[in-house]
Amino acid sequence: MPESRTVALVTLGCARNEVDSEELAGRLEADGWKLVDDAEEADVAVVNTCGFVEAAKKDSVDALLEANDLKGHGRTQAVVAVGCMAERYGKELADALPEADGVLGFDDYADISDRLQTILNGGIHAAHTPRDRRKLLPISPAERQEAGAAVALPGHGPTDLPEGVAPASGPRAPLRRRLDGSPVASVKLASGCDRRCSFCAIPSFRGSFISRRPSDVLNETRWLAEQGVKEIMLVSENNTSYGKDLGDIRLLESLLPNLAEVDGIERVRVSYLQPAEMRPGLIDVLTSTEKVAPYFDLSFQHSAPNVLRAMRRFGDTDRFLELLDTIRSKAPEAGVRSNFIVGFPGESEADLAELERFLNHARLDAIGVFGYSDEEGTEAATYGDKLDEDVVAERLARVSRLAEELVSQRADERVGATVRVLVESVDPAGEGDGVRGRAEHQAPETDGQVLLTSGAGLSVGRMVDAKVVGTEGVDLVAEPLLGSPEWSEEAGR
């Protein structure tokens, strides 16, 4: 019997890319490929790249070069680029980076197995010429669902399989194959974006906004629960737009309670919310539905009106603070995170001071700060009044220092509070990191963790109530409560 073909998936970038990698993994495994964790053990190393900002693109190139270094002295025979940077640059990337044996776009995903086999056999796959993927779907959202059947939409599940391939209880295989044993998994709610932020190129390569049907999201969530997942995080470029192409802009409000009722799911988290599209009903559902985390990942980006207008965005400091007041009037301990761009073209000292005023009053749990840099193909790249790089760097350092101080202060405010923690890692020796998890106000990777002072009887995937007794920067230190049903049940075994 011939030795099985092996493939490793290396994922960079956001949670949406993680979903796409698991779809690719499912397709490859269904076609006989053996998935391995270490690229050194793979015939083909597939690097799922990020093309968001310059630093992310550099990381993607570095990962491709690192994988290429494995060729010639191990099992690895080919390195293939997929993902956003591959889609965005296509042939340009292939010409600039001959170390990659193939550059595959989203349209290649349905045939990923054949593409990799061709490359592994020494064949050449001609990289695509990039196109604006917004033009693949109708301008009218109401017409997109029908047209979407003919468009590659990574993470939406395959549309190229015959009916009846998989049981009705779950998504049609091969939808995805989990690449780790984490009790947390992202679920793609939609793809693309209809907003026209002047600094962002994502819509050009991810396309116009298109929702997944609620039944598909529910089926995938049930399947994930069967795999041991306890928390799902809904991801897309803009979750607040969910349902607008399905005839119901409030569809998220009705979907969330249904997701929370899926057997085995203990927490539902929503990410990527646009402040300008927040509505009272959505705030109500996010703050009052059992098992739905009162968590708000709000994309503020700035708070000075002049800068926001130049960004083609809406709002100001006072309106954003009013939104936060509304949220906290319903859920005082709600978690809030956001990202900000400093050094945007035309940003004055007064604009920066206005952003700092907002940050000082907002009491955010997590803050990401980025220095502006031109992204080709964006409106902002054509702007005059650009700031010198050293000015951008100074402002980035200044606001980053403030952000670090503020999120530490916000963590201190939670001392004495009771938090519900999903256990994500347990050191069996009781040393090192001990038992770590996340509370409702903490999303994976970005928002800090909770270190539990006692781990007796706790295991990965358990929920436990704990009292916050201290902090380590943005992280919390908490003591499990003896009365927590899950802790007591597990500890007594």
From Swiss-Prot:
InterPro entries: Elp3/MiaA/NifB-like_rSAM, Methylthiotransferase, Methylthiotransferase_CS, Methylthiotransferase_N, Methylthiotransferase_N_sf, NA-bd_OB-fold, Ribosomal_uS12_MeSTrfase_RimO, rSAM. Residues 153-177 are annotated as: Disordered. Binds 2 [4Fe-4S] clusters. One cluster is coordinated with 3 cysteines and an exchangeable S-adenosyl-L-methionine. The keyword Iron-sulfur applies. [4Fe-4S] cluster 1 binds at C14, C50, C84. It holds the Pfam family TRAM_2. PANTHER family: RIBOSOMAL PROTEIN S12 METHYLTHIOTRANSFERASE RIMO, RIBOSOMAL PROTEIN US12 METHYLTHIOTRANSFERASE RIMO. This is Ribosomal protein uS12 methylthiotransferase RimO. The gene is rimO.
